[in-house]
Amino acid sequence: MKKIIIAFVFLSLPIFGQIKFNDYFLNKTLRLDYYHTGNKTSETISFDKLIEEGPWSGSKKNLIDTFYYGNYIMKVFDQASNILIYSRGFSTLYQEWQTTEEAKTVTRSFEGSMLFPFPKSKVFVEIDNRDRENNYKKIFEKTISPEDYFIIKEKNNSYPDFKVHYSGDPSEKLDIVLIPEGYTKEEMGKFHKDCDRLSNVLLNRSPFKESENKINIWGVEAPSNESGTDIPGKGIWKNTLLNTRFYTFDTERYLMTSDYFKVRDVAANAPYDQIYILVNTNKYGGGAIYNFYSETAVDNNSSDYIFVHEFGHGLGGLADEYGNDKTYEDMYPLDTEPWEPNITTLVNFDKKWKKMIEPGIPIPTPEEVKYKNKIGIFEGGGYVSKGVYRPTMNSIMNSFTSTEFNEVCKDALQRIINFYSE
């Protein structure tokens, strides 16, 4: 079996390398919206709609995902040849909800949406989920014709966009779109200033500062009727564009939105690979999900830290490196290697940062002063104190006392920046 798998990999690589954008795609974007429904032990994906959006701003070279991060992967196949012509890994708010206590007794639906280049000919799209043993299982498939007259072309959510940081052609850069939540029309000037401030914070952190010329950052002027955001635990409800709220999954600081279709609508006004929601509040909070969106409150003393930390999740698929957080139950099975690049259960550590550890560093690595600035294997991470390990004693993915990514996280982020900017 091992020989068969290896042969398949080598046979597949030349095929992937031969995928040329213009052979299969037009220079515009197709959005597939769906509903994700289920509970702790079951899930289904049901189709909602297709929307034609603007020019394709993703890489036209790197069409096939090479990282396999995320709890799901979307694959697009040319129907005539059965060749894989596009794929992306991602995670969802639904999947996080599945790990909560509520999911044991309640069935819920969440909005989901994926983008891919607009195909020239018929394609079939599938979405696979990753089970607890790291195996993929197909849970959705749909054949799509570019001639389908039900593909929506109307533009109902048009807002002005602006450049925050510009380096060049969006198809050759990592494009980040900053979208406002809880900023009224009169507060758009503040939104511009917040975009500038937080973008500067990001571009002054490694590895982003070394890759400044590989990154575009955009803003969208999309005002809300009221300023601020919902705080259900305090009885505060605001009429805002994206319906963000604190107390997501009954965790006060977890600031997210389940209105993902609206998030996509607003983001579509600018080129983007990554979505970042800036929430106009001084209350501490934020959140992010890999290739879904990132979100932060902008006006508290920790906003700069949160902005960078959350983008580590959203862009790089980085895990939280702290333990002792009971928000999620059994997020990382100890008999399976996590897909996140910066934590390990030691089940398959050879695929992680083993080569970055200096000779003589003990494994596991004790939390002693002499190892403070060393890469090792420190127990505690992924919300638990035992059985999950992190690369360093501290980093921005661990606590407020560090403002920098560790070298393992920098390496993971740099590879993704390069992927988008080729």
Q: Can you say where each PLM-predicted feature lies in the sequence?
A:
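Boundary at the C-terminal end of the N-terminal hydrophobic targeting segment
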Residues: 15-17
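Sec-dependent N-terminal signal peptides
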Residues: 3-13
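Beta-strand-enriched, solvent-exposed domains that form extended recognition/catalytic surfaces
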Residues: 24-149
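Fold-level signature of zinc-dependent metallopeptidase catalytic domains
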Residues: 150-206, 219-229
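Active-site-proximal segments of metallohydrolase catalytic domains
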Residues: 214-290
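Active-site recognition of the HExxH zinc-binding catalytic motif
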Residues: 74, 199, 304-321
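Short pre-active-site segment immediately N-terminal to the catalytic Zn-binding motif
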Residues: 188-191, 286-310
